[in-house]
Amino acid sequence: MFRSSQLLRNGIRGMRNARIPIIQLKPSPFMPMRAQLYSTKANNEPPKLRFLFYMFIFASGVLYVTGSQIEKKKPKSSFTEKEFEEYESSSGLKRRSKLISTQDAEKYKFFVVPYVHQNEFITKIAQKLGDKEVRIIDPEELIKREREDESRHYSYLLQDLAQEDKPLPKGLVTALIKDDIKFYLNTRNGTFDTNFLIKNYPQTTDEAIKFENDISDISKCIVLHYDMLNELKKNKGEENARLINNVVGYYETVNKAKIITAKHDELDDKLQEISLEFI
């Protein structure tokens, strides 16, 4: 018992005198980051707001530049006169001009009769237009002359179409009328104020639009009520009658159609009565 107590006291005394080595712990690499995260958590919000603000500015700039490029590539649908002149100068293109210039629009007037069965009506209308020089244009005569004169531009084409019984290409009648008007303007009579009266034309809306694009505006479309009602379908067929009626409707929409009431006895070929309500 005494020996056990002595050993215990010696052990305690030894522990007191023992030197305990000090171990230096290496700092963990995660400790500073963790500490920093905790220490700056409250300060993270302002950088996030700045980042979103900068992203908004950047995105807005990209959208603006992209939109500007698309707008530049988009073809313009309208020009001022100055812009058009600059465009013509830079591109080398010239705008399509009508045969009759704006300055000559008052000097030369154009009247069309989509369908007429008897030439007496054309004579009466020409008399009403007699305050100026009057030139009557018959597309059928122009086609015949062009076909028979092989020196003319469309002669062989018209010959082939006639042999094969094919319809005329779109715009050909208007081209022949344009050539005839151009020739007339270079004559002495063409220097005077002139009313042009074109019979049996236009008979499609395509020809009507081409005339106004290439030659001049139409002053009036004269609609012969009797012939349209009684002779048109009988002589031109249902489909052609429909096309000609569409022409009348086209001019009515632009307020350029003038209906002339003409009456005569159906059993008598001679014109007995005509009343003109004109312009």
Swiss-Prot record:
Q: Which residues form the signal peptide?
A: none
Would you tell me the Gene Ontology cellular component terms? mitochondrial membrane
Which InterPro entries does UniProt cross-reference here? P-loop_NTPase (IPR027417)
Domain of life, per UniProt, equals Eukaryota
List locations, semicolon-separated. Mitochondrion membrane
- TM ranges: 51-70
**Record keywords: Cell membrane included?**
no
Q: How does it sit in the membrane?
A: Single-pass membrane protein
Transit peptide feature range: 1-35
Task: Indicate whether GTP-binding appears among the record's keywords.
Answer: no
Gene3D superfamilies in UniProt: P-loop containing nucleotide triphosphate hydrolases
Keywords recorded for this protein, A-Z: Membrane, Mitochondrion, Transit peptide, Transmembrane, Transmembrane helix
Q: Which family does it belong to?
A: Belongs to the AIM36 family.
Q: Would you tell me the protein name for this molecule? A: Altered inheritance of mitochondria protein 36, mitochondrial
Gene coding for it: AIM36
